[in-house]
């Protein structure tokens, strides 16, 4: 059975732990769970192949910045998460999470994940954001950010409703099974010959 290591990063309270628990247990936790560091493991079938998926949940709080990278070695794929109802967490993808991941693991693929998709159309959420002259992050904004940070995919999901949840992890596995393209491997595979 092939093993894939997937590390999940993003601001505190964007739903990283709920994402992992909902996926691995099919149950949504009812209360906020502060994470320092945790791992989950599950055996799944993707495209007819048995996979042992090791999921590494990291703390998003600044207090843990100096330790978080210790979970990065041998990572096959990163899920960089932000909450669709939290524009500040979206901006931190550019300001904090992409720089941190690309500094420590420049050749490891990234999937950008917008969490809490169920709240994008929620009236209370929209009103709370409107009071602060904000709005939920749009799909287009997420897609543009994914291109900017060179993510291999942009996906949205809800841990509460599980909409898009399986797709996030199926894509993480598919991405982890594909060796990263470094400039050297791209050059070797190039069909271009200069004479």
UniProtKB/Swiss-Prot annotation:
One GO process term, biological-process aspect: regulation of cell shape
Membrane topology, as annotated: Lipid-anchor
InterPro entries in UniProt: P-loop_NTPase, Small_GTP-bd, Small_GTPase, Small_GTPase_Rho
Cited PROSITE patterns: RHO
Residues the record lists as Cysteine methyl ester modifications: 192
Disruption phenotype: RNAi-mediated knockdown causes distal tip cells (DTC) to make extra turns in approximately 20 percent of animals during the last phase of gonad morphogenesis.
Main localization, broad class: membrane
Residues that, per the record, bind GTP: 10-17, 57-61, 115-118
Compartments, record wording: Cell membrane
Residues spanned by motif Effector region: 32-40
Alphabetical list of Pfam families matching this protein: Ras
Any GO CC annotation of this UniProt entry: cytoskeleton
UniProt keyword Transcription, yes or no: no
Chain residue ranges for the region called Disordered: 176-195
Annotated lipid attachment (S-geranylgeranyl cysteine): 192
Residues of the propeptide: 193-195
Gene Ontology terms for molecular function: GTP binding; GTPase activity; protein kinase binding
Keywords linked to the UniProt accession: Cell membrane, GTP-binding, Lipoprotein, Membrane, Methylation, Nucleotide-binding, Prenylation
Function: During gonad morphogenesis, plays a role in distal tip cell (DTC)-mediated guidance of gonad elongation.
Family named by the database record: Belongs to the small GTPase superfamily. Rho family.
Protein name: Ras-related protein rac-2
């Amino acid at each position: 059975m092939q093993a894939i290591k997937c590390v999940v990063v993003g601001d505190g309270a964007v739903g990283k732990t709920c994402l992992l628990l909902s996926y691995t247990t099919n149950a949504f936790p009812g209360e906020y769970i502060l994470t320092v560091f945790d791992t989950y493991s599950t055996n799944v079938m993707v495209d007819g192949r048995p996979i042992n998926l090791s999921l590494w949940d990291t703390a998003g709080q600044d207090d843990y910045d100096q330790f978080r990278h210790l979970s990065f070695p041998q990572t096959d794929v990163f899920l960089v998460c932000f909450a669709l109802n939290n524009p500040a967490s979206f901006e931190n993808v550019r300001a904090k999470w992409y720089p941190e991941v690309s500094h420590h693991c420049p050749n490891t693929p990234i999937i950008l994940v917008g969490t809490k998709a169920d709240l994008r159309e929620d009236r209370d959420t929209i009103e709370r954001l409107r009071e602060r002259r904000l709005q939920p992050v749009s799909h287009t904004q997420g897609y543009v950010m994914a291109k900017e940070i060179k993510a291999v995919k942009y996906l949205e999901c809800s841990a509460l409703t599980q909409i898009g949840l399986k797709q996030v992890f199926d894509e993480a596995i598919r991405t982890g099974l594909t060796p990263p393209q470094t400039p050297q491997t791209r050059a070797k595979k190039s069909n271009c010959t200069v004479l």
